[in-house]
UniProtKB/Swiss-Prot annotation:
Its EC number(s): 1.1.1.86
Catalysed reactions, semicolon-separated: (2R)-2,3-dihydroxy-3-methylbutanoate + NADP(+) = (2S)-2-acetolactate + NADPH + H(+); (2R,3R)-2,3-dihydroxy-3-methylpentanoate + NADP(+) = (S)-2-ethyl-2-hydroxy-3-oxobutanoate + NADPH + H(+)
Entry keyword set: Amino-acid biosynthesis, Branched-chain amino acid biosynthesis, Magnesium, Metal-binding, NADP, Oxidoreductase
Lineage: Bacteria, Pseudomonadati, Acidobacteriota, Terriglobia, Bryobacterales
Name by which UniProt lists this protein: Ketol-acid reductoisomerase (NADP(+))
Co-factor requirement: Mg(2+)
Domain of life: Bacteria
Keyword tRNA processing: no
Catalytic residues in the record: H108
């Protein structure tokens, strides 16, 4: 079993006298910056000129610098911008300032594992990856609870890489819940697989296929939406709270029997074979090469798929039905970014 770390294993002294640069101020960036600041860590935020996030960070009382100046000022640099822009940002603005003894940190291992970022050998390279979106990382920190996280050491030039990563996790609030030891390869490959085969790709296609099956059979799209998409959250919440057994305990016996007898016909041997193929494509670097090339050539295919998905019947019906659901937090409907 991998090592697990808790509050007793972290020591903020390993960040004492050090400045941490949070590069980016999005979902994770704002949570990391605010939590570390509130834990007594000296924090600066690195944002490009003209960033819309600058005003938000400054309103929160944080010092904002350019990414280059933030990296120059800091002893610890946490990169929390999207995967596809990390390499250029690192190479152009951060790398020149990663002098011996500094720490380069990530919340996801994509660019290190697939060689898009190649740090010098005389710095520490670590990961602290909270297993929750940024708003939950911040919310639970303020409640004194914290979210679980993963920790990994890729380079240990100083001999204190793990200790500093655990100090960061402590300041972030994650050691209250517990942090599990991993490595960059395991985190990256398992994270991508989970996204592609289960959480995003798998779940989305399952929902779309179920919806379309009912609609093609003559059922009202509105009914199909409720049965195949809307109620999914109810089931996922039960699974997250207590596992599959708790979900099955909580639903009707009819639903549970259908689970046992029909579920394996949906996710069958052919599905499992495709899952293995998807994992193999991740492990070999094929997916990474495809995604990197997509970004280098203007994201034409990606943006076309995004627009097509936005205009699917299930999405059109969903936008209409959510107007009825006053119990949902009112959120602006998401459009389709063109770039």
């Amino acid at each position: 079993m991998p090592n697990r770390y808790y509050e007793k294993d972290g020591n903020l002294d390993f960040l004492a006298g050090r400045t941490v640069a949070i590069i980016g101020y999005g979902s994770q960036g704002h949570a990391h910056a605010l939590n570390l600041r509130d834990s007594g860590v000296d924090v600066v935020v690195g944002l490009p000129a003209g960033s819309k996030s600058t005003a938000k960070a400054e309103a929160a009382g944080l010092k904002v610098l350019s990414p280059a100046d933030a990296a120059k000022t800091a002893n610890v640099v946490m990169i929390l911008v999207p995967d596809h822009i990390q390499a250029d940002l690192y190479n152009n603005e951060i790398a020149p300032h990663m002098t011996a003894g500094k720490t380069l940190m990530f919340a996801h291992g994509f660019n290190i594992h697939f060689g898009q970022i190649k740090p010098p050998v005389d710095i520490d390279v670590t990961m602290v990856a909270p297993k929750a979106p940024g708003h939950r990382v911040r919310e639970l920190y303020t409640e004194g609870v914290g979210v679980p996280a993963l920790v990994a050491v890729h380079q240990n030039a100083t001999g204190q890489a793990l200790e500093r990563a655990l100090a960061y996790a402590l300041a972030l609030g994650c050691l209250k819940a517990g942090v599990i030891d991993t490595n960059f390869r395991e985190e990256t490959e398992s994270d991508l697989f989970g996204e592609q085969a289960v959480l995003c790709g798998g779940a989305a296609e399952l929902v779309r296929a179920g919806f379309q099956t009912l609609v093609d059979a003559g059922y009202a799209p509105e009914i199909a939406y409720f049965e195949c998409l809307h109620e999914l959250k109810l089931i996922v919440d039960l699974i997250q709270e207590g596992g599959l057994s708790y979900m099955r305990y909580s639903v009707s016996d009819t639903a549970e029997y259908g689970d046992y007898t029909r579920g394996p016909r949906v996710v069958n041997d052919q599905t499992r074979a495709e899952m293995k193929k998807i994992l193999s494509e991740i492990q070999s670097g094929e997916f990474a090469r495809q995604w990197i090339e997509e970004n280098k050539t203007g994201r034409k295919n990606f943006l076309a798929m995004r627009e097509k998905g936005h205009n699917d019947q299930i999405e059109v019906v969903g936008r209409e039905l959510r107007e009825m659901m006053t119990f949902l937090k009112k959120k602006k409907e998401v459009g389709v970014p063109v770039a």
